[in-house]
Amino acid sequence: MRTSPLHPATDSVVFSRPACQSAPTVPQSGFVSELGYGAQQPLLSLLLPPLLRQLGEQSRWQLWITAQHKPSKRWLSACGVPVHKVMQLRRAEAGEAIYAMEQALRSGNYSVVLGWLPPLTAAERLRLNRAAQAGRSIGLLMQPQEGKLAAAAPPQAHAANRGSARYH
């Protein structure tokens, strides 16, 4: 049951900007979030492209810190991401990659920094969060999820897969 009255349709808060005008894309404060990816995570392919496209409207760059993953220019273009604003740092060692992500987030030169990093300690996560807040940037920690899903499978599934391995 609703106890408070509905606001009238002319409420200036609701209609403060035209519907076609996008919301501001500069976060008031930065943050770091973990995103799981893998064959069993199709939702990521629906969420990530619009986010990258919207962040591409900013004057800032997008940085991908990757171990082996290379963003496809064709895929980025098809998603509407401005490829001329995407930079990639490849083959950084784990410690260097964490440090690079921290410095990139803190600089404020990047709207988003995507990092394919090993699992982080609580102290490393805290450092990245503080850096993101200082630079008003978004940090996305990309984590593979296939192993976690297999571990969550019922015991019968593990027994059926005993003795076989799948390599990518």
UniProtKB/Swiss-Prot annotation:
Is Oxidoreductase a UniProt keyword of this protein? no
**Post-translational changes noted in the entry:** Is rapidly cleaved and degraded by the Lon protease once DNA damage is repaired.
Q: Which domain of life is it from?
A: Bacteria
List the Gene3D superfamilies hit by this protein, alphabetically.
P-loop containing nucleotide triphosphate hydrolases (3.40.50.300)
**Alphabetical UniProt keywords:** Cell cycle, Cell division, DNA damage, Septation, SOS response
Cell cycle keyword on record: yes
**Gene Ontology process terms (BP):** division septum assembly; DNA repair; negative regulation of cell division; SOS response
Chain positions of site Essential for degradation by Lon protease: H168
One Pfam family of this chain: SulA
Q: What does this protein do?
A: Component of the SOS system and an inhibitor of cell division. Accumulation of SulA causes rapid cessation of cell division and the appearance of long, non-septate filaments. In the presence of GTP, binds a polymerization-competent form of FtsZ in a 1:1 ratio, thus inhibiting FtsZ polymerization and therefore preventing it from participating in the assembly of the Z ring. This mechanism prevents the premature segregation of damaged DNA to daughter cells during cell division.
Q: Which PANTHER family match?
A: BLR3025 PROTEIN-RELATED, CELL DIVISION INHIBITOR SULA
Oligomeric state and interaction partners are given as: Interacts with FtsZ.
Task: Provide the family line.
Answer: Belongs to the SulA family.
**Name recorded for this polypeptide:** Cell division inhibitor SulA
Q: Species lineage, top-down?
A: Bacteria, Pseudomonadati, Pseudomonadota, Gammaproteobacteria, Enterobacterales
Coding gene? sulA
